[in-house]
From Swiss-Prot:
This is Small ribosomal subunit protein eS8. One of its GO terms (cellular component) is cytosolic small ribosomal subunit. Keywords: Ribonucleoprotein, Ribosomal protein. Residues 1-41, 128-169 are annotated as: Disordered. It comes from the Eukaryota. Pfam families: Ribosomal_S8e. The keyword rRNA processing does not apply. GO terms for molecular function: structural constituent of ribosome. InterPro entries: Ribosomal_eS8 (IPR001047), Ribosomal_eS8_CS (IPR018283), Ribosomal_Se8/biogenesis_NSA2 (IPR022309). Residues 146-169 have a biased composition (Basic and acidic residues). One of its GO terms (biological process) is ribosome assembly. Belongs to the eukaryotic ribosomal protein eS8 family. Residues 8-26 have a biased composition (Basic residues). The gene is RPS8.
Length: 221
């Protein structure tokens, strides 16, 4: 039969008279959803649409460009997991990438950028006093080596950048785990990409609460 977007085949709820029947038209066609899956075997299909235009239907993806708004930086990174979807839990269970889905992305590219831009290694776990003593000598040598690598100009530049540096504690916490919460803002089934932005501020707090509540429910069940 095929998916049709016309209303001719629908019954009237009021029991009113049907229109005169005619065959389906090409411009009334519908296509099944892409249901883009999270998979390393990247698959994108070319679809010819009305007017000779082209859409890119992503069937499997695992990477995307994600922007960190407050730092005005964008990096290509791996999508690790789909954790929340406001419209449908089934899309989380089946790891489906759709617009506005909340995903976890790899923090490594952003961590690397932060280190080169500010000279600060974020997300490092604090060690116990015993471990500190053992590693103190090795760290001193490493620190000395790092200092010798940087010129005065670079050091001055980093110090100036550090003056205005602010970092959301929630984001810093996520850097420790190596996974950042992000939102997909592109439409993978239409443009063939799963791009988005890192969650920050009130939006991040909102979704963290949602995930915490979801985790609590599953623990009770």
């Amino acid at each position: 039969m095929g998916i049709s977007r016309d209303s001719m085949h629908k019954r009237r709820a009021t029991g009113g008279k049907q229109k005169a029947w005619r065959k389906k038209r090409k411009y009334e066609l519908g296509r099944q959803p892409a249901n883009t899956k999270l998979s390393s075997n990247k698959t994108v299909r070319r679809v010819r649409v009305r007017g000779g235009n082209v859409k890119w239907r992503a069937l499997r993806l695992d990477t995307g460009n994600y922007s960190w708004g407050s730092e005005a930086v964008t990096r290509k990174t791996r999508i690790l997991d789909v954790v929340y979807n406001a419209s449908n839990n089934e899309l989380v269970r089946t790891q489906t990438l759709v617009k506005s889905a909340i995903v976890q992305v790899d923090a490594a590219p952003f961590k690397q950028w932060y280190l080169t831009h500010y000279g600060v290694d974020i997300g490092r776990k604090k060690k116990t006093p015993a471990a500190k003593k053992d590693n103190a000598e090795g760290q001193e040598v490493e620190a000395a080596a790092e200092e010798t690598k940087k010129s005065n100009h670079v050091t001055r530049k980093l110090e100036k950048r550090k003056e205005g540096r602010t970092l959301d504690p929630h984001i810093e916490e996520q850097f420790g785990s190596g996974r950042l919460l992000a939102c997909i803002s592109s439409r993978p089934g239409q443009c063939g990409r799963a791009d988005g932005y890192i969650l920050e501020g009130k939006e991040l707090e909102f979704y963290m609460k949602k995930l915490q509540r979801k985790k609590g429910k599953s623990a009770v069940a």
